[in-house]
Every structure is written in C-alpha cells, then in structure tokens.
C-alpha cells in the first residue's frame, strides 16, 4: 500500500503552460507558393485569454499577473489581454471553447496537466501539440494536501485515521475527477481500501475555501495557491505529492518521505 501511494501521488505535478488555439495558415514568411510575404502588424486588437477555471484560483491569479505585466511592457497602448474565465469539466469546457476560436493569434488558452490526464482517461480527444500551438511553460510544481487549521484533519495522521475509519468518512474538494487532485484522491481511496466522498468546484480557490469553511476535510492544491492562507493560519499543509522536498515550503513532509518504498 505505502509503495503504491508514494509512486502514484509523486507523479502528480502541476504542468501549466500557455498555448494558442488551433494550427492556422501561415501569416508571415512565405505564402503557399514559397514567395516572401510581408508580416502583418500584430497585434492590432485585444487578445482573448481563456482560463478554463473559475476566478481566484492559482491559475487565474498567476495568469492575470502575467497578462497585466505583458500588457504594460509588451503590447501597444491600444491593445490589452482580456481574461475570460470559462470553468467546468475539470478545465475541458474552456479548453474546448478555445478550439472553436479562429487560429489567428488573438486567442490564447491556459492549459495544465489536467488536459493530458483527461486525454489519457478518454474524457477528451484533444491532443495538446496537435490542436494547440504551445507558447511557454509557466509553472511546474507539486501538489499539496491541505487540511483545516483545527479539527480531525488538521494533521496528516488525523486525516489518515479518519480516512481509514470507513467508507465516505472524509470529503475531499476537487476540480474534477480527471484533475491531478482527483487522481490523487482516487489513489488514496485505492491505497487504503476506503471510498472517499468528493465535491467538485470550479477552481482551486473554491476548493481551498471549502476546507476553510468545513464543507470538505481536505484538498490537493498547487503549493503556491495556498502559501498565503497557510501563513495566515487558516489552512494547514499536510503533505506534498512529490518525490523530494519543496523549496517553497521546506518544512512540509513529502509523500516519498512519509510513505517510503517497502
């Protein structure tokens, strides 16, 4: 059991990148006949930025900070990035909406590891490198299992004890069963032989809030997404889904340490 939980959960990392929707025709360089063509001015109008999760989550906050900086430093004064939060389906609703837009460089979509996982489990036919043009990787970090500041699940031992007490004894907040947090929850369920009740929310911020208010016992979330709440004492970090210690929260145990291979 311990070996299985360490190996599976340690693979759940947040890979987050920005991509352009679709693969369109050439817009500069050479035309279909091979002759040189002049590159059009770009951009001349606002650029839509689809974030496939609700406002306030880790991806939303990071994206807005990035786009604001780029708007100020890299775009003409009459052009801005316009953020659109399109939540649902563990990120699939917004991602699929991005594919319906023209492949003209005026729509970009934030995607993360959820898309790859959803593809692997058959929830979508989207192939990242075929249906999108990746631009840049923005984030690569482990997930953190967090619990409330007080109560039965405020420590890893307490959470595991409650989990092991019977089916549906704990409730975990997730953004979708195909998300890293959803898979981590399934891994815990399989490892301990107990059913875990899950509640799906539109964003990681909503998941964290559900733990604070007591709606859920715990959630798996990006490390950077809860650093402020942990520092403020409203949430507690229980463990990392990582094979090594995190630089951002070095005092938190990691799963390969808590559950070493046997």
Sequence positions of predicted segments:
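Short, low-complexity disordered leader/linker segments with a strong preference
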Residues: 1-48
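N-terminal (or domain-start) structured segment
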Residues: 31-130, 194-218, 229
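Short, surface-exposed alpha-helical segments at coil->helix boundaries
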Residues: 60-64, 68, 182, 186, ...
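Hinge/capping helix and adjacent helix->loop/strand transition within the periplasmic-binding protein
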Residues: 75-77, 97-107, 120-206, 255, ...
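Short beta-strand segments
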Residues: 109-111, 172-174, 220, 239
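Short secondary-structure boundary segments
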Residues: 113, 149, 223-224, 242
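Short, high-confidence coil segments that cap the C-terminus of an alpha-helix
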Residues: 167-168, 216, 235
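C-terminal lobe and pocket-closing loops
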Residues: 228-262
